[in-house]
């Protein structure tokens, strides 16, 4: 009989091993066997929990997305209630330590690439995109007319993605201070234009 709570412990262990495998070998080099090796368990156990490599990547991305959503909620809750502060909190969540660690950044890049070919991953990406846009739009709408708020949300979402992507591809740690400053300046510009 399995130990109580072991399933979640084992899944977390395997997701961590998947992140490390993608970091070290890329998505093509990540297999059920490479994940099992990093987790010091049998390939059969990985298969038991996730089925196949696609199931493993989906579970890993769900974990990364939960971390992003948790960071967003935590930072928005802690921010002052004005739109500028809450927008800055949303931006900061996208550059949270849970999102800029090398294994996570490489997993995001692999996920984006795979989401163009896998319907489930595409759906996850679509949900993430809509959630970011909705959160940004809700805050901009407190200070801007609805149409302008939607446009501002699209622009800021593109800036967040672009800053994050450039940072991820730079080959070293993301300069979060510089990225946040650019995003904050953009927010200030948009809110001042009204």
From Swiss-Prot:
An annotated Gene Ontology molecular function: transcription cis-regulatory region binding
Top-level lineage group: Bacteria
Residue ranges occupied by any HTH tetR-type domain in the UniProt entry: 8-68
Keywords, alphabetical: DNA-binding, Repressor, Transcription, Transcription regulation
GO biological process: glycine betaine biosynthetic process from choline; negative regulation of DNA-templated transcription
Pathway as given in its UniProt record: Amine and polyamine biosynthesis; betaine biosynthesis via choline pathway [regulation]
Pfam families the record matches: TetR_C_6, TetR_N
Start-end of DNA-binding region: 31-50
Annotated PROSITE patterns: HTH_TETR_1, HTH_TETR_2
The protein's role, per its UniProt record: Repressor involved in the biosynthesis of the osmoprotectant glycine betaine. It represses transcription of the choline transporter BetT and the genes of BetAB involved in the synthesis of glycine betaine.
Protein name: HTH-type transcriptional regulator BetI
Gene: betI
